[in-house]
Swiss-Prot record:
Gene encoding the protein: cobT
Record's keyword terms, sorted: Cobalamin biosynthesis, Glycosyltransferase, Transferase
Organism ancestry: Bacteria, Bacillati, Bacillota, Clostridia, Eubacteriales
CDD domains with a match to the protein in the record: DMB-PRT_CobT
Species in which this protein is naturally found: Desulforamulus reducens (strain ATCC BAA-1160 / DSM 100696 / MI-1) (Desulfotomaculum reducens)
Top-level EC class as recorded in UniProt: transferase
Protein name per Swiss-Prot or TrEMBL: Nicotinate-nucleotide--dimethylbenzimidazole phosphoribosyltransferase
Length: 351
């Protein structure tokens, strides 16, 4: 059995008995029912995922950041050149990027992995290699990768999770680095939903109107050339996806198989979540949406996943920065259900 098939076979629904027990506990606490909103949803969802009536704080918090390049940047869809990808990797490894700062604040570890940066393999202390190939091919003229490479990218993400996250309970957040990666993400969303490319394509790194129109045309051309099958996640990933998108989909599937909650970041991790959901619909039960990105397609992604974002921060950086902000929110939800007094304990009359 392949690693992907084995992982998919292990994914189960969260424990509904534990969910119901957690909901009863939340309703008995000294507050009007439901008054802590999404914080309560997080608490009972965690109970089901951890398969305990009272969810526990994570013993390990890890932000897994995957880096990969995209052949479609040859079409001029990004404001930044491709060499920024390896330059930013070195910034991550030196602790100077946005994700490093926010993960430090949250007490989380950052793991940076090269899954498909263009050019020769990068040799840098602290960089994990799970390379599938040297960047994807240009999906405007043909498939981004082969179906076998798509499977390898997903399995690389599963393996990375297994190697880097050992403690339980754990909390994992995903992030990425890859110049041009909003282009395949928009293509993936269009492939799965059939929505007009114009409505779901944004400015990415901040391109002007002229380049935005060009980006839309490139995505349309890629969808026409490749004709990805919306009912086959591997087909969509291989034809118009990215290696880091496949890797993040693998991390999500691995978390679902291991009973680990996984925090999504923005638009690119949302594309990975759609691929994961296509391969294993139950995997969405393990996903938490950290924030709503300003990329126009992100709201559509979250609707398709059935997830509500915790935050609206007008962010569009990627790297896992929005996901890192969710760490203390999730831990707060755990503390609320465990530490807040019930009406009976506090001697407070119920409404």
């Amino acid at each position: 059995m392949t690693l992907l098939a084995e992982t998919l076979s292990k994914i189960q629904a969260p424990d509904q008995t534990c969910v119901e027990q957690a909901k009863q506990r939340l309703d008995s606490l000294t507050k009007p029912p439901g008054s802590l909103g999404i914080l309560e949803d997080i608490a009972w969802r965690l109970a089901g995922i951890q398969r305990v009536p009272l969810p526990q704080l994570p013993r390990e918090k890890v932000s897994l950041v995957l880096a990969g390049d995209h052949g479609v940047v040859a079409e001029g869809v990004s404001a930044f050149p491709q060499e920024v990808t390896p330059q930013m990797i070195f910034n991550f490894l030196q602790g100077g990027a946005g994700i490093n700062v926010l993960a430090r604040q949250a007490g989380a570890k950052v793991v940076v992995a090269d899954i498909g940066v263009a050019g020769p393999p990068l040799e840098k202390t602290g960089l994990v290699s799970c390379r599938v190939k040297s960047g994807t091919d240009n999906f405007a003229v043909g498939p981004a990768m082969s179906r076998e490479e798509a499977v390898k990218s997903i399995e690389a993400g599963i393996s990375l999770l297994q190697q880097q996250v050992k403690e339980r309970p754990a909390l994992v957040a995903i992030g990425e680095m890859g110049i041009g990666n909003t282009t395949p993400s928009a293509a993936i969303l269009a492939a799965f939903t059939g929505m007009p490319v114009e409505e779901i394509t944004g400015r990415g790194t901040g391109i002007d109107n002229q380049r935005l129109q060009h980006k839309i045309a490139v995505i349309k051309r890629g969808l026409e050339v490749n004709r990805p099958d919306a009912n086959d996640g591997l087909d969509v990933l291989s034809k118009v996806g990215g290696l880091e998108i496949g890797g993040m989909a693998g991390i999500i599937l691995g978390c679902a198989a291991e009973g680990i909650p996984v925090v999504l970041d923005g638009f690119i991790s949302g594309a990975a979540a759609l691929v994961a959901q296509s391969l294993a619909p139950l995997s969405r039960e393990y996903m938490f949406a950290s924030h709503g990105s300003v990329e126009p397609g992100h709201r559509i992604m979250l609707e398709k996943l059935g997830l509500k974002p915790m935050l609206q921060m007008e962010m569009r950086l990627g790297e896992g920065t929005g996901a890192a902000l969710a760490y203390p929110i999730i831990e707060s939800a755990v503390r609320i259900i465990n530490e807040m007094a019930t009406f009976a304990e506090a001697g407070v009359s119920k409404g």
